[in-house]
């Protein structure tokens, strides 16, 4: 600056250029000449910044020229002005990362000096880097001089730190003034504030400028006497000075607190922490909850020494780390959005995999393959990771695209394990617990800044998880006051704060996946869902999917789970012999910051893709199936067949993250008319279904169907949401609400439903149609009949029930058909599918059972249902019976004994049947109920008459039901 002078005695930030300093500068210049990759990095930053600055200045010049044109161009000109003004100058910081391994290979003494005496080796190295940048700087555009390399360049370090890789607990006095690497969790972050480096003052009388440099313990690597924080008011001649703030130099300044990782802390001791000072381009890189690796110089502030109150004792000095680099640890980070670098090789594999017909099953089976079962929950989690499409309408309405999931059920059903898997898989996920989180801890809190004393906002878990996932365990343990705080977040996706003079709105656009236990500790099937969950309907309706996970007693399933758990305990990591103790994994950072640079060539040449997935090379897409750990995926691949031999294809977790990231960023599906028709029909069916009267079916359920269908379209990388996506969404929602698993029958039922609708008469309602049977003699007078009762899994207005009713409509074509035509055997594939559903204990309609157990051609004898226990005194009723079924007498049957597990099974089935239409008159015949119960069970689990009567007697004694007049009455 022309005519500027400094003040005598001022401390400067530069070292005096002595001979040793110059030798170190020349030595580091030789290092940069040897490793040309660093020179290329400097040049690339210069070119990027100059081009960006040139484009920015050109846009500003064009905007100024357009201002002279007036308002002739109307709205178009205004839009161009807004677009030009929104363009911001985006330049890269003048900082490059140096590998300590390369420096050790070049000059071991210089490498040792960087680690042991950074205050005397880093400044000459940065001086050499700045001189190199100045010599390479040729500004190609006259308007881009603002980003010239005359600004000093900084060095960051990565590589092996050896004994200097520490934690906050292992930092000792011997590490003072040395370069260290510290791993930990960020617990506190201060506000980013400007720090004065140089003040400029103007003397009006002499017309000269004066400056003063300011240093403190956090500015320089060496501990010097700090500069007084007082502006000069007069120059040496006594002339009055005016501070020119525009000419003064400021840098950003932030203080963070890094705490020791809990897994590294010794048993029984609290984690320790250390303060880190971040300046300039390092500020605002982390937030509370992030796991980071900080590289910096460990030094003392100098504040300490003799105790003021008692001069005979000494107190310790305050220490901190002057940050040099901050590396986020994405593998275990809970607050940093881990963005994967997608190479051309990855994109090709993603596109090839998306064309597979079973892509939804492949990706869902790859989610937590070690967890046995829960196939529908895994599919829902995959759709939650994909998310729907967020929309902000012109009228100010906000339609969220994030999917919320709630899991409620018995203990020990892997609910928390699923949450942990989401926490370690999602790009941005934060974990909380119900009792350990408060309302302000989830949303935002108003605190006092310890440096300035001002009121400030601290973001809670949901604000920190913006554009991510919040995992809340033990959701039922939260108090009502704290739970109310998340109502706004789950629907409006904002947090409104009005306290302590602060009124603001924060974004909290996150998905919520929560796990809760029932009110009574175990889910009671005899009670309604809302009585078991004990959460208000206003909160339940905000969850898109609510899964009830029960620990049912099933001998086959229990044996398979126990074998799976035992196989997991038998697993040995690679390289270990049987009986050899597994050594504790050492968390030593042998290479700090190596993940910062990703070489695409390594990814493209080191693994096999989708096309050569069977080769012996390392595969980055599919992983090898491990029967000891991934038996759950094999069960899902074989559709619940415990003896299945089909091996699943499992995608690796890193590739799954890339697939989800690609689908969320690149694909925005649009609804089609056929998908809209399916969504509207399923929504109206659910609203008019008697089985969903006790569950809140609101307009949010309609948006749930849209979000699920859109997320499924993202799984296929489709630009449109078609009928298949809507059917999958409806199937998943119906399973969450009613426990129905339509499975592979959904396409068949939909086609038959539409065909029946096209043929039915418009004068008659399908609910009032009765099944009309024509006698074999074709006499012309139909037999009086009543509508066939549906099972617990049937729904009045669903396609399945409509198909069953409309198939036997009273038109001329069906009136003459023989009843035996209905009992024709099924094809082999359909029969195998029904057998599979029976083995799993899934609900199968009685009519499909009749198809399954139909006699072969040429067989004689009456039609009897296979597996139903034959009871004594069975007589057919030809008269006009209420149920049009065979009357079974229990007069000569004595109640037997029933085990606890079998009693729980029959209680659950009866409780579910009591909520269906068969108990419309508050009662149902004992014999007919016996047949209904056995219709829902596989062959090996059907109840005998003695077990059935024993179960009724126990339930009657417990006042769960009443038996009178050969009927079971609902209490």
Curated annotation (Swiss-Prot):
GO terms for molecular function: ATP binding; ATP hydrolysis activity; chromatin binding; DNA replication origin binding; helicase activity; MCM complex binding; single-stranded DNA binding. Residues 52-78, 594-614, 749-825, 842-893 are annotated as: Disordered. A motif (Arginine finger) lies at residues 541-544. GO terms for biological process: DNA replication initiation; DNA strand elongation involved in DNA replication; double-strand break repair via break-induced replication; mitotic DNA replication initiation; pre-replicative complex assembly involved in nuclear cell cycle DNA replication; premeiotic DNA replication; silent mating-type cassette heterochromatin formation; subtelomeric heterochromatin formation. It catalyses: ATP + H2O = ADP + phosphate + H(+). SMART domains: AAA, MCM. Present with 35100 molecules/cell in log phase SD medium. Early fractionation of eukaryotic MCM proteins yielded a variety of dimeric, trimeric and tetrameric complexes with unclear biological significance. The MCM2-7 hexamer is the proposed physiological active complex. Pfam families: MCM, MCM3_WHD, MCM_lid, MCM_N, MCM_OB, WH_MCM3_C. It comes from Saccharomyces cerevisiae (strain ATCC 204508 / S288c) (Baker's yeast). This is DNA replication licensing factor MCM3. InterPro entries: AAA+_ATPase, MCM, Mcm3, MCM3_WHD, MCM_CS, MCM_dom, MCM_lid, MCM_N. Component of the MCM2-7 complex. The complex forms a toroidal hexameric ring with the proposed subunit order MCM2-MCM6-MCM4-MCM7-MCM3-MCM5; loaded onto DNA, forms a head-head double hexamer. Interacts with CSM1. Residues 775-801, 873-889 have a biased composition (Polar residues). Acts as a component of the MCM2-7 complex (MCM complex) which is the putative replicative helicase essential for 'once per cell cycle' DNA replication initiation and elongation in eukaryotic cells. The active ATPase sites in the MCM2-7 ring are formed through the interaction surfaces of two neighboring subunits such that a critical structure of a conserved arginine finger motif is provided in trans relative to the ATP-binding site of the Walker A box of the adjacent subunit. The six ATPase active sites, however, are likely to contribute differentially to the complex helicase activity. Signal peptide: none annotated. Belongs to the MCM family. Keywords: ATP-binding, DNA replication, DNA-binding, Helicase, Hydrolase, Nucleotide-binding, Nucleus, Phosphoprotein. The modification Phosphoserine is found at residues 761, 777, 781. One of its GO terms (cellular component) is replication fork protection complex. Residues 761-772 have a biased composition (Basic residues). Its EC number is 3.6.4.12. Residues 359-566 form the MCM domain. It is an enzyme of class 3 (hydrolase). ATP binds at residues 409-416. Residues 58-77, 811-821 have a biased composition (Acidic residues).
């Amino acid at each position: 600056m022309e005519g500027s002078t400094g003040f005598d005695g001022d401390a400067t930030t530069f070292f005096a250029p002595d001979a040793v300093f110059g030798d170190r500068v020349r030595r580091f210049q030789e290092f940069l000449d040897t490793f040309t990759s660093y020179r290329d990095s400097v040049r690339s930053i210069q070119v990027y910044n100059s081009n960006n600055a040139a484009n920015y200045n050109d846009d500003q010049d064009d905007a100024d020229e357009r201002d002279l044109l007036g308002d002739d161009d109307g709205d178009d000109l205004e839009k161009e002005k807004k677009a030009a003004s929104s363009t911001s100058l985006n330049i890269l910081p003048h900082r490059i990362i140096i590998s300590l391994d390369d420096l050790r290979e070049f000059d071991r003494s210089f490498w040792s000096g960087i680690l042991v005496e950074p205050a005397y080796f880093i400044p000459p190295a940065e001086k050499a880097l700045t001189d190199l940048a100045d010599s390479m700087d040729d500004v190609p555009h006259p308007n881009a001089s603002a980003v010239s390399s005359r600004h000093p360049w900084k060095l960051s370090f990565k590589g092996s730190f050896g004994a200097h890789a520490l934690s906050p607990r292992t930092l000792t006095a011997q590490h003072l003034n040395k370069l260290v690497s510290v791993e930990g969790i960020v617990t506190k972050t201060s506000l980013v504030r400007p720090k004065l480096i140089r003040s400029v003052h103007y003397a009006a009388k002499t017309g000269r400028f004066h400056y003063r440099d300011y240093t403190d313990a956090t500015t320089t690597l060496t501990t010097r006497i700090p500069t007084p924080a007082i502006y000069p008011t007069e120059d040496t001649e006594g002339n009055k000075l005016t501070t020119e703030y525009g000419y003064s130099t400021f840098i950003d300044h932030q203080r963070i607190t890094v705490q020791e990782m809990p897994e590294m802390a010794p048993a029984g001791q609290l984690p320790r922490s250390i303060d880190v000072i971040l300046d300039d381009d390092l500020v605002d890189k982390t937030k509370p909850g992030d796991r980071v690796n900080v590289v910096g110089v460990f030094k003392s502030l100098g504040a300490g020494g003799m105790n003021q109150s008692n001069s005979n004792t000494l107190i310790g000095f305050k220490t901190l780390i002057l940050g040099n680099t901050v590396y986020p640890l994405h593998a275990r980070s809970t607050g940093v959005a881990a963005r994967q670098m997608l190479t051309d090789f990855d994109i090709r594999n993603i596109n090839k995999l998306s064309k597979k017909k079973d892509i939804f099953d492949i990706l869902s089976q790859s989610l937590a393959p070690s967890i046995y079962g829960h196939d529908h929950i895994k599919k829902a989690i995959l759709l939650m990771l994909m998310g729907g499409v967020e929309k902000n309408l012109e009228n100010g309405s906000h339609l969220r695209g994030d999917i919320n999931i709630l899991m409620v059920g018995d203990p020990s059903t892997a609910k928390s394990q699923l949450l942990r898997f989401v926490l370690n898989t999602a790009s941005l996920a934060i974990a909380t617990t119900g009792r350990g989180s408060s309302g302000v801890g989830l949303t935002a809190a108003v605190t006092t800044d310890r440096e300035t004393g001002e009121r400030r906002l601290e973001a809670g878990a949901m604000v920190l998880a913006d554009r991510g996932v919040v995992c809340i365990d033990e959701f039922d343990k939260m108090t009502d006051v704290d739970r109310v705080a998340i109502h706004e977040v789950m629907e409006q996706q904002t947090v409104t704060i009005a306290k302590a003079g602060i009124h603001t709105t924060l974004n909290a656009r996150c998905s919520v996946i929560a796990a809760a236990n029932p009110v009574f500790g175990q889910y009671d099937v005899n009670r309604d869902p809302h009585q078991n969950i004990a959460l208000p309907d206003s909160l339940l309706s905000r969850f898109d999917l609510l899964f009830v996970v029960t620990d049912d007693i099933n001998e086959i399933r229990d044996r398979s789970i126990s074998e799976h758990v035992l196989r997991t305990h038998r697993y040995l990591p690679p390289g270990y012999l049987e009986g050899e103790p597994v050594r504790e994994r050492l968390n030593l950072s042998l290479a700090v910051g190596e993940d910062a640079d990703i070489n695409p060539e390594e990814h493209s040449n080191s693994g096999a893709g989708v096309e050569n997935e069977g080769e012996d090379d390392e595969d980055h897409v599919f992983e090898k199936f491990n029967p000891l750990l991934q038996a759950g995926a094999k069960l899902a691949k074989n559709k619940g067949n415990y003896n299945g031999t089909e091996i699943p294809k499992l995608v690796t977790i890193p590739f799954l993250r890339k697939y989800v990231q690609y689908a969320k960023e690149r694909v925005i599906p649009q609804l089609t008319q056929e998908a809209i028709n399916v969504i509207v029909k399923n929504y109206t069916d659910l609203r008019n279904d008697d089985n969903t009267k006790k569950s809140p079916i609101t307009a949010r359920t309609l948006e749930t169907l849209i979000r699920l269908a859109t997320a499924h379209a993202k799984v296929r990388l489709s630009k449109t949401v078609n009928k298949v996506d809507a059917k999958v969404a409806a199937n998943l929602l119906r399973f969450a609400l009613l426990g129905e698993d339509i499975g592979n029958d959904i396409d068949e039922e939909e086609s038959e439903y539409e065909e029946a609708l096209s043929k039915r008469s418009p004068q008659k309602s399908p609910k009032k149609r009765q099944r009309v049977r024509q006698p074999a003699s074709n006499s012309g007078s139909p037999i009086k009949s009543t509508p066939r009762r549906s099972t617990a899994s049937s729904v009045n207005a669903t396609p399945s029930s409509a198909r069953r009713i409309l198939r036997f409509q009273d038109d001329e074509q069906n009136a003459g058909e023989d009843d035996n035509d209905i009992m024709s055997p099924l094809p082999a594939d359909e029969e195998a599918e029904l057998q599979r559903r029976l083995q799993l204990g899934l609900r199968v309609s009685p009519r499909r059972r009749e198809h399954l157990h139909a006699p072969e051609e040429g067989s004689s004898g009456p039609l009897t249902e296979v597996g139903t226990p034959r009871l004594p005194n069975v007589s057919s009723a030809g008269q006009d019976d209420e149920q049009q079924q065979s009357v079974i007498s229990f007069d000569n049957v004595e109640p037997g004994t029933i085990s606890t597990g079998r009693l729980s099974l029959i209680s659950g089935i009866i409780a579910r049947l009591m909520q269906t239409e068969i108990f419309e008159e508050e009662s149902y015949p004992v014999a007919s109920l016996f047949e209904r119960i056995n219709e829902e069970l596989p062959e090996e689990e059907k109840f005998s008459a003695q077990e059935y009567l024993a179960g009724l007697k126990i339930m009657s004694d417990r006042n769960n039901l009443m038996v009178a007049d050969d009927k079971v009455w609902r209490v």
